[in-house]
Amino acid sequence: IAFSARYNWWRIPQSYKKTRVLMYHSISEHIGKEKHNKWRVKPEDFEKQMNWFYKNNWKSFTISQLVKLDKIPEKSFVITFDDGFEDNFTNAFPILQKYNFKATIYLVPNQKINHWEEKNTSVLSNLLNNEQILQMQNSGLIEFGSHTLSHVNLSTISDEQLLNELKESKKEVENIIKKECEAFAYPYGKFDEKIVGFV
């Protein structure tokens, strides 16, 4: 689980009434000692994690489903994937189907401009194509949200650029999924009161 060592929620007794949010990026094998391995979870490990939630009778929701609930049930959890890597389809999706678990994937529609991967010498993987996105959505298990237009740190750009990143990314995602885009994730987890207001 991405950043699991940082949060350590499994070491501190927590009420089952609290929803767990599992945040992933790439579900793929590690490559040597490559620095981007921190963003990768091996398919075998992802399978074990999903199996644990399944055997312990946890119920998955998409983000938009969860926020609409009047009362959140015990043992509820959300699975999210940032950036929309192709291995979310090839490696994660079959496992989610096996356990009938739902997930939210946050897309970066503009794959040619400023995607954070392109700034590094190693690319984690390709991104999802439209056909894969629609196949996942049509399964009824996967929801797609926006992760801005170009994966930019929203705290470093002008208000005009910020508004463009939000509006255009929402529009682009909706052009692909043919329905309203209801979910959003902040790139790098960077946001403040002003950015939240714009969102």
Regions found by a protein language model. Give the residues of each.
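Secondary-structure boundary/capping motif
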Residues: D87-N88, L154
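Metal-dependent polysaccharide deacetylase catalytic core of the NodB/CE4 family, i.e.
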Residues: L22-E29, W39, K75-F77, Q97-D192
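Structural motif corresponding to alpha-helix initiation and N-cap regions
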Residues: P43, E47, F89-T90, L127-N130, ...
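A short acidic, amphipathic alpha-helical/loop segment
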Residues: N91-I95, K194-F198
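Non-membrane alpha-helical structural segments and their capping/turn regions in soluble enzymes
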Residues: P43, E47, E86, D159-N164
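N-terminal pre-catalytic segment of deacetylase/amide-hydrolase enzymes
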Residues: A2-F77
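Noncatalytic alpha-helical scaffolds and linker/capping helices
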Residues: D82-D83
